[in-house]
Amino acid sequence: MRTLRITLLSILLLGMGAVASAQNGKCLPMRTDGVDPYQPGERIVFNISYNWHAVQTDVAKGVLTVDQQSLNGEKVWHTALNMQTAPFFDVFFKIRETFESWFALKGVEPRKFHRDSREGDYHAINDYIYDRRAGKIHANVEYWDKDKETLDIPYGDCTYDVTTLFYYARRMDFPNLKPGTVYKVSIAIDKEVQTANLTYVGLENKYIRGIGTIAARKFGLSLKKGEVFEGNQDALLWFSDDDNRVPIAFMAPLKVGAMNGRLGSYSGLAHDFTALISPKKVK
């Protein structure tokens, strides 16, 4: 079951988070029209499934929520991602993941991060405080089999945590992205910063089971070949092509089969879901 743990965490990092970038030292361009793609009270549910030949089984669910809080006298966004395996799968391998981020109302500048991951007998806790002036992330990292470690992680202009990255991605300047452009992506997790390559593919109408057909922006993410991911293939990511920029799907090729995520339900969106061009008919 170690492979499942690595797979779900890797997909969480690469499929939902690693979309901030640096190209020639610059981050991926953000929209400048002042439109917020999310609002307090938004709730997005993702279904995560494993596919192998004719076998397709939902094994986990992720829930993303948004609100606003006060942090050290500053009003900030607070976002949370909670992921857990399905009840039937808990018998084989139980996963409970919580990721929380606090970031500035303007500019998505991170302030604080908390991670609590419980996966089988594995348990990890990350607590970050961002110090832009010092260029450091003050981190407390703890594992189930080790003492808590306090350290500083390098903090660059384009370095984010899992959930902050996800909401940064939703503020991308979609109209100015050019198909085929490759960006470097970075994300802080545990005691290090991880990188990969992100390629903007272009527009696509994507069918989501249970939801309908959605106009989307498609991205490819190059994954390092290893014990879980297959080499020479990209993970694929889709965001709705409207003012909400909702993540609607991802796919990551594995050594055996593939892991897929799809939008399951949504509520409290900041704008009309105009990207939903062909809703599923309710009988």
Q: Which sequence ranges carry the predicted segments?
A:
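Positively charged n-region of N-terminal signal peptides that target proteins for export
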Residues: M1-I6
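Acidic, serine/threonine-rich low-complexity disordered tracts
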Residues: Q23-R132, F174-K283
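Bacterial N-terminal signal peptides
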Residues: T7-G17
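Sec/Tat signal peptide C-region and signal peptidase I cleavage site
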Residues: A18-A22
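Active-site/ligand-binding surface loops and adjacent short beta/alpha elements
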Residues: R132-I189
